[in-house]
């Protein structure tokens, strides 16, 4: 349902800044040792962070725009393990099929995301009865089903500030066995909905869909809570998060009847007013998405633990080729007027993971493209109880062994390692 947003430019704008990477830590703050789990980065405004944190944990209700179909009622409901902002227990459900050899997300039945809950009859205004209807499970026509766990958000503000060129340079340096034939296969450029006109290298989400945390938040607000939003980004109207999701069922009734959204300029009076305000450049109105983005942007990375392998695990990590995608690069960026160094152990690129890929993509994607998954950062893995994109295991050895496609060589190296070598590697991972 509708929630009107006018993006606060200073908060929502993608804060990419000068930075880079190095093999050794410099004199900047080691971001992953400077705070406890769930704390803010050094230099963060404490009052703003507390307000944003409260908004992230706030339970939405119908009057806030919740629904009519949704998966949870707050950001914190899906991001709370260890501390607010962490991994969640929920597994998002995706589906689709292949039509003439390419992916079809079955948009006519609300695909490719299935929302688990619906508001049966909500009256948002006099004379309007919003009916979400009953979902069909599985959705008609679906032949591909996948689960995706909710990812932790610790340290993502630092990731947002990694320069595009740094990620592109990592991609260019990787061998074809890891990146495929073309570097362009790995990199997705996003012109964000809340940062219109700023095209950057995407780095968030299992499929690397978003480059900015504002878009990451706006996407979740719509697809996980059913709260539609519009934005005034650089004075332009952005409508991509302004359309209600369809219920996951077939036929003309799949359209959510009577549920107002912001998608029809000149017909929806509220939308027309928003369009006029956007033309006037109204950007200084606080909104939920800005708070969500501020909270994630200023969360410190998960603190590192003690490496009980005495350094042997990192050596084994590199020997087995894990560092091909989970790069050991130390990135250095500026935030809150300070310089931070951090090791997320990810190249923030997508790779063809073969049988491990979830098979979900955009309409028209080839099967190979649907197998591409973003390299999940390993920092904070010691706080997670679900591994791989669908949380199929909590066992690190099993997760390594399940790597396929462009990760198969590392899985093979792990399988052929001695018991002592494997133990050293697992001890190292348990320190991250």
Please provide the spans of the model-predicted regions:
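Periplasmic c-type cytochrome electron-transfer domains
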Residues: 21-432
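Bacterial N-terminal signal peptides
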Residues: 8-17
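Bacterial N-terminal signal peptides that target proteins for export
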Residues: 1-8
């Amino acid at each position: 349902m509708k929630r009107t947003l006018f993006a606060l430019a200073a908060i929502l704008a993608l804060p990419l800044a000068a930075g880079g990477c190095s093999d050794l830590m410099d004199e900047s703050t080691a971001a992953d040792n400077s705070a406890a789990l769930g704390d803010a980065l050094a230099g963060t405004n404490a009052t703003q962070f507390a307000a944003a944190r409260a908004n992230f944990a706030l339970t939405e209700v119908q009057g806030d725009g919740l629904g009519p179909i949704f998966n949870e009622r707050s950001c914190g409901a899906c991001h709370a393990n260890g501390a607010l902002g962490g991994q969640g227990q929920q597994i998002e459900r995706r589906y689709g099929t292949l039509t003439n050899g390419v992916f079809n997300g079955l948009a006519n039945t609300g695909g490719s995301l299935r929302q688990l809950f619906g508001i049966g009859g909500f009256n948002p205004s006099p004379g309007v009865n919003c009916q979400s209807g009953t979902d069909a499970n599985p959705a008609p026509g679906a032949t591909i089903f996948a689960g995706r766990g909710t990812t932790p958000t610790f340290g993502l503000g630092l990731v947002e500030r990694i320069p595009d060129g740094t990620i592109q340079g990592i991609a260019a340096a990787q061998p074809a066995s890891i990146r495929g034939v073309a570097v362009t296969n790995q990199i997705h450029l996003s012109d964000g909905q809340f940062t219109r006109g700023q095209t950057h290298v995407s780095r968030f989400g299992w499929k690397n869909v978003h480059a900015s945390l504002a878009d990451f938040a706006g996407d979740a607000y719509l697809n996980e809570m059913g709260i539609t939003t519009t934005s005034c980004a650089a004075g332009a109207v952005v409508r991509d998060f302004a359309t209600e999701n369809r219920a996951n069922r077939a036929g003309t009734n799949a359209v959510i009847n009577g549920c107002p959204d912001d998608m029809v300029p000149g017909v929806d009076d509220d939308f027309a007013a928003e369009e006029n305000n956007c033309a006037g450049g109204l950007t200084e109105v606080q909104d939920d998405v800005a708070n969500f983005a501020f909270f994630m942007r200023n969360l410190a990375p998960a603190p590192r633990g003690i490496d009980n392998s005495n350094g042997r695990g990192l050596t084994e990590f590199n020997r087995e080729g894990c560092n091909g995608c989970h790069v050991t690069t130390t990135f250095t960026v500026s935030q809150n007027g300070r310089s931070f160094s951090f090791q997320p152990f990810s190249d923030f690129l997508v790779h063809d993971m073969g049988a491990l890929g979830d098979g979900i993509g955009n309409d028209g994607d080839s099967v190979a493209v649907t197998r591409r998954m973003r390299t999940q950062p390993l920092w904070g893995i010691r706080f997670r109880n679900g591994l791989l994109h669908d949380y199929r295991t909590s066992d690190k050895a099993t997760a390594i062994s399940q790597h396929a496609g462009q990760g198969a060589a590392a899985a093979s190296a792990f399988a052929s390692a001695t018991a002592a070598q494997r133990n050293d590697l697992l001890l190292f991972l348990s320190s991250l």
